[in-house]
């Protein structure tokens, strides 16, 4: 059986929800729809529950509007990373990656590209929580159309918990990129996968060296602006799933 646990809050859409591994009573929710199109609903920041969703508290980042990803440190539920796409309809500085080390009492922006570019995906290294990969996405919605992609889109990596970031581009398509999806091996730190939207070289990419270089494996990337979600099998990182209208699976 199921019951609603968020109906009393003043927002109706989630971008992501994360459960603390070190204390499963604690949940964090990033509000605002992460998908594109005319009907994308915005949110009002991050919420936290300490009783498995029975009650919720707003803990900030109200002006981020669209949150795509929330990651909780596996050993410390007070450390949380939030990936914000920002306001879909206008330029704003409330985009990028925000980090809290005190359970949401305060936030620090640790990655910012520009006022048109936010975060569409993030993954944390399963063996080293100081290593985080982030996919940035330049996107804006206008009355007359939608602009998805640009020079701001790319893949970034930190090895020190967000203090410094490096852009990972070797082997990826040149020029403007669109939406990017990320997945990381749950047992081998250097194995990464990415779906890349590009005018000529869209497809499924793999890195075997922690993102230093990438190799295009195939051209599969259906309707990237809607989907671009991939996941690895927790026991065998050669098994990867891709969500689209259909469900795709690879074993090699």
Kindly give the residue locations of the regions a language model identified.
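Beta-propeller blade termini and top-face loops
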Residues: 1-252
């Amino acid at each position: 059986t199921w019951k609603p646990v968020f109906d009393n809050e003043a927002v109706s859409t989630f971008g992501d929800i994360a459960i603390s591994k070190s204390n499963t009573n604690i949940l964090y929710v990033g509000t605002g729809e992460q998908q594109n199109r005319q009907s994308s609903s915005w949110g009002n920041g991050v919420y936290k529950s300490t009783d498995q969703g029975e009650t919720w508290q707003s803990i900030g980042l109200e002006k981020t509007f669209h949150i795509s990803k929330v990651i909780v440190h596996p050993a410390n539920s007070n450390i949380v990373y939030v990936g914000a796409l920002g306001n879909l309809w206008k330029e704003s500085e409330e985009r990028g990656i925000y980090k809290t080390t005190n359970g949401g009492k305060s936030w620090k922006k640790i990655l910012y590209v520009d006022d048109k570019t936010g975060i569409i995906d993030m993954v944390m290294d399963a063996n080293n929580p100081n290593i985080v990969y982030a996919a940035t996405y330049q996107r804006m919605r206008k009355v007359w159309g939608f602009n998805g992609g640009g020079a701001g889109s790319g893949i970034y990596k930190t090895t020190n918990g967000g203090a410094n970031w490096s852009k990972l581009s070797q082997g990826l398509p040149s020029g403007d990129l669109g939406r990017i999806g990320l997945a990381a091996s749950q047992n081998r730190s250097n194995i990464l996968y990415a779906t890349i939207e590009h005018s000529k070289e869209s497809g499924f990419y793999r890195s075997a060296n922690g993102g230093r270089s990438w190799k295009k494996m195939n051209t599969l990337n259906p309707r990237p602006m809607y989907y671009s979600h991939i996941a690895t099998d927790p026991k065998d990182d050669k098994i990867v799933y891709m969500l689209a209208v259909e469900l795709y699976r690879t074993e090699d």
